[in-house]
Amino acid sequence: MQIGQRLGTPLSPSATRVMLLGAGELGKEVIIALQRLGVEVVAVDRYPDAPGHQVAHRAHVIDMTDAAALRAVVEAERPHLIVPEIEAIATDALAAIEAAGLAEVIPTARATQLTMNREGIRRLAAEELGLATSPYAFADSFDAFSAAVAKIGMPCVVKPVMSSSGKGQSVVRTEADVKPAWDYAMAGGRVNHGRVIVEGFIDFEYEITQLTVRAIDPATLETRTYFCEPVGHVQVAGDYVESWQPQPMSALALEKSREIAHKVTEALGGRGLFGVELFVRGDDVWFSEVSPRPHDTGLVTLASQRQSEFELHARAILGLPVDPTLGSPAASAVIYGGLDERGIAFEGVRDALAVPGADLRLFGKPESFAKRRMGVALATGASVDEARERAKRAAAAVRPVSAR
């Protein structure tokens, strides 16, 4: 496929075909962005009627950690590009698919392998690139875990090497927390990996996501790195509940953040948007994690930027020019399911959209859980503080209710 100049017509022999592996709320927005450019999109997920399935040209339900099933769906659909949107994927199969010339993996198969778990990316960042991180240790048994906690010291953070949205993540503050933290991590991993990272506690002031885009510069036709304004966010139990843009920070801290983001994304290579998570205290910055795809905290860019993180990702992977310019201060606030039920309804939508500058994204997930992210309220404002207040007010107005 000729990247960057030619796009075909969906559902025709000329179609530019993209397959998303993972069709949640972030994948759904990427699909919409791709379809606006006339791309034929195939969405794959582990459960039926996922948000992205509802808007894709075609949908498949498979276990994406099953290498044979993954290879079969790729051979059946013959996409030009494969875009992983989650971590729980048979990445060795992706490497084989790319090596066989069946499709190009975004950003690269190697990047997907490195970032599929926290061990690969932490070793790249700290040991190969020499970036500042929290002290850390890995463990694959309870005895090794106990020794790691003793080595790192308390308090410390425990995470499965493969999980997302805070699943399996906890803080060990006393000896009484050690066994429950191990059990919780084992239950919360995306796949039955049985391995955790123990991280020392960093006394940071705030966290940011530095959205970083590797895209083709139309002036040189070479890959160039672009930065969005920093996204601030609040996490509870490892799961984002609120984000805003721009996050105020010192010029030196911003420079360091972008230097770290540039180094790690350059090492991963390829094209696309990356979410680089960082801890900041004063002028000091520590690397935390990176995702080679749009980031949940970046949902705020649907309101804040001329091109959202999803549009930036779509353009970058297609070899098209990008523009990460900030349009307005904005914020997002999560709307939780509140109850465990399929096919819930939402009340208070009119009230939410009556908040000045507010908008909603209801994701359309077929099943709700009390703490499952079912939507997000967005708002712009003259300042970040005003946008945050509006987003939280709009989110609070939405009431998930039983449809029974």
UniProtKB/Swiss-Prot annotation:
Name the Gene Ontology molecular function terms of this record: ATP binding; magnesium ion binding; phosphoribosylglycinamide formyltransferase 2 activity; phosphoribosylglycinamide formyltransferase activity
Sites binding ATP sit at R118, K159, S164, S165, G166, K167, G168, Q169, E199, G200, F201, I202, E207
Q: In which pathway does it act?
A: Purine metabolism; IMP biosynthesis via de novo pathway; N(2)-formyl-N(1)-(5-phospho-D-ribosyl)glycinamide from N(1)-(5-phospho-D-ribosyl)glycinamide (formate route): step 1/1
Q: Which reaction does it catalyse?
A: N(1)-(5-phospho-beta-D-ribosyl)glycinamide + formate + ATP = N(2)-formyl-N(1)-(5-phospho-beta-D-ribosyl)glycinamide + ADP + phosphate + H(+)
Q: What does this protein do?
A: Involved in the de novo purine biosynthesis. Catalyzes the transfer of formate to 5-phospho-ribosyl-glycinamide (GAR), producing 5-phospho-ribosyl-N-formylglycinamide (FGAR). Formate is provided by PurU via hydrolysis of 10-formyl-tetrahydrofolate.
EC primary class: ligase
Is Magnesium one of the keywords UniProt gives this record? yes
Task: Give the signal peptide range.
Answer: none
Domain ATP-grasp, residue spans:
123-318
Q: What is this protein called?
A: Formate-dependent phosphoribosylglycinamide formyltransferase
Question: What InterPro entries has UniProt attached to this entry?
Answer: ATP-grasp, ATP-grasp_carboxylate-amine, ATP_grasp_subdomain_1, PreATP-grasp_dom_sf, PurT, PurT/PurK_preATP-grasp, PurT_C, Rudment_hybrid_motif
Q: Which GO terms describe its biological process?
A: 'de novo' IMP biosynthetic process
As for family, the record states: Belongs to the PurK/PurT family.
In its keyword annotation, does this UniProt entry include Chloroplast? no
Oligomer and partners: Homodimer.
Keyword annotations for this protein, in alphabetical order, are: ATP-binding, Ligase, Magnesium, Metal-binding, Nucleotide-binding, Purine biosynthesis
Q: Where does Mg(2+) bind?
A: E277, E289
Pfam family membership, one: RS_preATP-grasp-like
* Chain residues that bind N(1)-(5-phospho-beta-D-ribosyl)glycinamide: E25, L26, E85, D296, K365, R372, R373
The UniProt record lists the EC number as 6.3.1.21
